[in-house]
From Swiss-Prot:
The keyword Isomerase does not apply. Mg(2+) binds at residues 40, 62. This is Probable GTP-binding protein EngB. Necessary for normal cell division and for the maintenance of normal septation. It comes from Wolbachia pipientis wMel. One of its GO terms (biological process) is division septum assembly. Belongs to the TRAFAC class TrmE-Era-EngA-EngB-Septin-like GTPase superfamily. EngB GTPase family. Signal peptide: none annotated. GTP binds at residues 33-40, 60-64, 79-82, 146-149, 177-179. Keywords: Cell cycle, Cell division, GTP-binding, Magnesium, Metal-binding, Nucleotide-binding, Septation. Residues 25-197 form the EngB-type G domain. The keyword Cell division applies.
C-alpha cells in the first residue's frame, strides 16, 4: 500500500547563495529539470497539496534552491532552479548554476535526484548534458516523465525506449507522472519514500 503524505510540509528557506544553504540535519530529495517541466507541480502532487510549492506559468522564475521540511524535518524536498530558459541576466544565471553544482556535489545528506523530463518533447540536449554531469559526478538519480496525459501511448512508449537506450543503465528507474493519472502518482510517491529513510 502506498504511504500517504498529507499537508505536514513547511517551506524552510530559499537559498540564493552557498552561504545561505540550511544545515544538513535531514535526508534530502532534490527535483531537477528544464524550466517549466513541472517540478513544483510534482512536489505538490507528492505531498497532496495544491500550494506548498509555488507553480508558475512563466518559465525560469525559480532562481533559488527552495527547501521544504516534511514531518518536523524528518526529511526534506528540494526544488532546484530549472535549467534552460530564464528571465535572469547572465551573471545571475551563472550564480545559481554554481549554486546548483555546489549543492549537488557537496550535499552529504542528498539521497536522490529526480530528473523531470517533459514527455511531449522527450530528451533534449540540455537534459542529456545535465544527466551526463550527474553520471560523471556519481550522483544517483531517477527519471520522471511529466505531462504523460498530453501524449499518446505510442509516443510515450517511444520516449521511454529512447531514454532507456540512451542511458543504458538498469539502476536508473523511469517513472511517469500526470495530475490526471492517480496510480502513476502513487508509484512515483512509493519510489520517493524509498529514499527518505
Amino acid at each position: 500500500m502506498a504511504k500517504q503524505i498529507t499537508s505536514n510540509c513547511n517551506f524552510i528557506f530559499g537559498a540564493s547563495d552557498i552561504k545561505s544553504l540550511p544545515n544538513e540535519s535531514a535526508p534530502e530529495i532534490a527535483f531537477a529539470g528544464r524550466s517549466n517541466v513541472g517540478k513544483s507541480s510534482l512536489i505538490n502532487l507528492l505531498i497532496n497539496s495544491k500550494k506548498a510549492a509555488r507553480v508558475s506559468s512563466k518559465p525560469g522564475c525559480t532562481r533559488q534552491i527552495n527547501f521544504y521540511s516534511m514531518y518536523d524535518d524528518k526529511f526534506r524536498l528540494v526544488d532546484l532552479p530549472g535549467y534552460g530558459y530564464s528571465h535572469a541576466g547572465k551573471e545571475e544565471i551563472i550564480q545559481y548554476l554554481n549554486l546548483i553544482e555546489y549543492y549537488l556535489i557537496q550535499r552529504e545528506n542528498l539521497r536522490r535526484v529526480f530528473v523531470l523530463i517533459d514527455s511531449k518533447v522527450g530528451l533534449k540536449e540540455i537534459d542529456k548534458d545535465f544527466i551526463y554531469w550527474l553520471i560523471y559526478n556519481n550522483i544517483n538519480f531517477n527519471i520522471v516523465l511529466t505531462k504523460i496525459d498530453k501524449v499518446s501511448q505510442k509516443s510515450l512508449g517511444a520516449v521511454i525506449e529512447d531514454i532507456q537506450k540512451w542511458i543504458n543503465n538498469e539502476n536508473v528507474s523511469i517513472h511517469q507522472m500526470s495530475i490526471r493519472v492517480k496510480h502513476k502518482i502513487t508509484k512515483v510517491r512509493d519510489e520517493f519514500f524509498k529514499f527518505t529513510r
